[in-house]
Amino acid sequence: MAQAQYAGTGRRKNAVARVRLVPGTGKITVNKKDVEEYIPHADLRLVINQPFAVTSTEGSYDVFVNVVGGGYAGQSGAIRHGIARALLEVDPDFRDALKRAGLLTRDARMVERKKPGLKKARKASQFSKR
């Protein structure tokens, strides 16, 4: 019989992560690379492991991720969101804990667009009264 697989899609900023959970040893693979190799920042790797910590399932699932768009922070947030959604498929009872930790909510904050006549989104050249 085929092994159980659980899927979830996560989004954050401009990053989209497609996540698959397979019962295993806790190995995380991102775009066919080990997570330590793909995401160099330890604090961002902690962000990725948050859903497992909240549901006390660390080391229970191997994670396979395909992520596109954004930078390290956006991709880490998208992976976290995808893992949380996939864990819901594993056990719907996780919903309460994941919701309380805020892991099921799509972070809607996006980069504000640059406006014409300004240097950045809100930065204007210095105002001179006289």
UniProtKB/Swiss-Prot annotation:
Gene Ontology BP annotations: translation
Keyword RNA-binding: no
Record-linked SUPFAM superfamilies: Ribosomal protein S5 domain 2-like (SSF54211)
Top-rank taxon: Bacteria
UniProt entry keywords in alphabetical sequence: Ribonucleoprotein, Ribosomal protein
Any one GO molecular-function label of the UniProt entry: structural constituent of ribosome
Recorded GO CC terms: cytosolic small ribosomal subunit
Keyword Ribosomal protein: yes
NCBIfam families, per the entry: PRK00132.1
Family label: Belongs to the universal ribosomal protein uS9 family.
Protein name, entry field: Small ribosomal subunit protein uS9
Organism: Streptococcus mutans serotype c (strain ATCC 700610 / UA159)
